[in-house]
């Protein structure tokens, strides 16, 4: 255990100030988003609106992110990561504040769409920023640590979201309590501006002026690299379809199936994120044993039994345990995938590569959000959620096997 901590401590000391500031920025933004994620669906229900509205808001948010990710990635490559992140954080914070106070269904949909647009600017620039400020040998550890810290910050946000809402409810109505919590979440998100403002970007070194059209240049100069981006995109689309059926509605699942309180829901989701953070540290160890591709696949496949346990159990305790392990195992491979992708593309198009990868994932959420709510409404609370979780397990299985077949052969070709 001492060797384990020493390894991570040694790694962290090698990171420059830009990386540490980026981590702080993501801590603040993830606390804010964690508070929103755990409570916002319930806010919509508290306004007296239906499950369909929740589905529409989630679909519009994801669709907006999918639409803007590639343009945001190109902007990040051409204008600089820091400028794009500052723009995204300030506007996202303001939009989140508006979402905390508006009640009209139309405004809920508009602000949900705007959230998807502006949060993408931070989202699309973070991984390329870390890649450009690190060495290849640092990246598996760095991306795992970054993801773990982000997840831990999300845990804090989820816990705050649940407990603050119940605390405020002691003094005011449920609706007002939720609204106060959401406003605090938006303030946390805006705090990310301050570490970003302190970052120092050397664009002359990282983003040469002669790189005018990264997308066309990349196709001409590195067709095999473009192939890698497309292959990653297909894998992410399959996982995104499965994720979009389940993940946006986990708070409603625990509320509807088990009548859990806001505090209990916040605690469960927070524990799931905490388990994910711990699993992130295990990722590099698995990579050393079996390689990057197999590590991703093994972690994803190991999550499936726990997903099905969550789907069919009638016990809140077992559902929570299944959720914790599914969450940890399924997400532990994400930083490994990011490291693998960043290692295969040029600096001038890292933002574009990352944006395409995230875009297709968001498309999965956009398309499957309304499908999920329709299935639950058609089959009822128990069988509706059970069917949704089962479909997700099937899509995860297909996505994992595809990743293994495609990238194992690609990795073998690279080694040759």
PLM features per residue range, with description:
Residues 2-16, 201-234:
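Juxtamembrane intracellular "pre-TM" segments in multi-pass secondary transporters
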Residues 4-64, 228-269:
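Helix-loop boundary and gating motifs at the non-cytosolic
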Residues 27, 95, 106-122, 237, ...:
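Hydrophobic core of transmembrane alpha-helices in multi-pass small-molecule transporters
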Residues 68-80, 165, 279-292, 376-377:
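Helix-to-loop junctions at the C-terminal end of transmembrane segments
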Residues 83-98, 294-309:
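Structural signature of the two symmetry-related core transmembrane helices
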Residues 113-150:
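Cytoplasmic helix-loop-helix junction between adjacent transmembrane helices
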Residues 166-187, 376-396:
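A membrane-interface helix-boundary motif in multi-pass transporters
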Residues 186-206, 402-407:
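C-terminal membrane-cytosol helix-exit motif in multi-pass small-molecule transporters
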